[in-house]
Regions:
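Glycine-rich beta-strand-centered segment in the early N-terminal region that forms part
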Residues: 23-38, 51-98
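NAD(P)H dinucleotide-binding glycine-rich loop of Rossmann-like/cofactor-binding domains
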Residues: 61, 65, 70, 85, ...
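Short glycine/proline-centered loop/turn elements that form peptide/ligand docking sites
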Residues: 81-85, 178-189, 223-226, 246
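Short glycine-centered segments of the SAM/dcSAM-binding site in methyltransferase folds
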Residues: 91, 153, 177, 237-238
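Mid-domain Rossmann-like dinucleotide-binding core that forms the NAD(H)/NADP(H) cofactor-binding site
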Residues: 129-200
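A short acidic, Gly/Pro-enriched loop at the edge of an enzyme's catalytic core
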Residues: 208-215
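C-terminal hydrophobic helical "lid"/dimerization subdomain
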Residues: 270-318
Length: 318
């Protein structure tokens, strides 16, 4: 099968198109013939940085060639002996073995059956692949950790990005009041997703406009930004961070406001995927795929992600 492999960290030129053997599945896995792959910022971090590669993939000491990627949608071609929920021919999607080694940049992927869900019939493989790591991050942050409920006021940063555009839609599906932040170019897009308000960070400080958010979802790197998110939360509210941990001054400021704080890392979960699939079937969330690349051009997808200006998601068609 064809795969995109990585032998050493570095630029996009380190991603090589290779021919390798199909993966063999165990009794609890299914073999997926991949139709679409989604690309995320974490993919580029793992490609660039040895520490990210070691920390997320957790490779064996003798492993020296890697297949990165986690987000797939495709068709079940083989099932393990213990698998009863899926059969050959089923269309499925999911985030595979994250954190860990998903090996998604390939024509075939071995996936634990408890990490995937049936693809909704009303969406394409490209839309499904997009709604995996990014949608799971939004779901787990808002639902699993923040326990979002109707009428919560939710402030979502980078609301037009991969995680953010799902977070807006998930929050609205719960009946929350949503305020998105981002650049002026993404304002109309985020409001069309259902956000009730939009703050253009290039023109005004969000913490000067909002100081009573019940939930703040912060996916922006840097302690300074997280301090401002803490200021935007109401006393007793919840702040979710994807990048910095709550330490030192951050912890002190959060404690003073009696905030619930969580630094989250998304993890593969088939039950959560089923909840996302349900919302997609109901038309409550949609994937915005801004660009598609052919498999051979996957390195160019990394290049686009690294601009930091992607609207919604980038997908590779296999």
């Amino acid at each position: 099968m064809k795969a995109i492999t990585l032998k050493e960290n570095g630029g996009i030129e380190k991603l090589k198109l290779s021919d390798i053997d199909k993966p063999k599945i165990n009794d609890d896995e299914v073999l997926i013939k991949v139709k679409a792959i989604s690309i995320n910022p974490v993919d580029t971090f793992v490609r660039q940085n040895k520490s990210s590669l070691q920390g997320i993939l957790k490779p064996g000491k003798d492993e020296n060639t890697f297949i990165i990627g986690w987000d797939v949608s495709g068709i079940v071609e083989e099932t393990g002996g213990n698998v009863t929920e899926f059969k050959n021919g089923d269309e499925v999607f999911g985030m595979i073995n994250f954190p860990g080694n998903g090996k998604a940049y390939a024509e075939y992927v071995a996936a634990p059956a408890d990490q995937i869900a049936l693809k909704p019939k009303n969406i394409s493989h490209e839309e499904a692949a997009a709604a995996t790591l990014a949608a799971l991050t939004a779901w787990q942050g808002l639902v699993t950790y923040a326990k979002i409920k109707k009428d919560d006021k939710v402030l979502i940063h980078a609301a037009g990005g991969g995680v953010g555009h799902y977070a807006v839609q998930i929050a609205k599906s719960f009946g929350a009041y949503v305020i998105g932040t981002g650049s002026s170019s993404k304002k109309d897009f985020v409001l069309k997703l259902g956000a009730d308000e939009y703050i253009d960070y290039t023109k005004e400080s969000f913490e000067k406009k909002v100081n009573d958010a019940g939930i703040v979802f912060d996916s922006i790197p840097g302690s300074e930004h997280l301090l401002r998110s803490i200021a935007a939360a109401k006393n007793g509210g919840t702040v979710i961070s994807i990048k910095p941990s709550f330490e030192g001054e951050l912890a002190d400021k959060a404690k003073a406001k009696e905030l619930q704080t969580y630094r989250i890392m998304v993890s593969s979960n088939g039950n959560d995927m089923k909840q996302i699939a349900k919302l997609m079937v109901e038309g409550k969330i949609h994937s915005h795929v801004s660009e598609k690349f052919n498999f051979e051009d996957l390195p160019k997808a990394h290049q686009q992600i690294e601009t930091g200006k992607t609207l919604g998601k980038i997908v590779v068609v296999v």
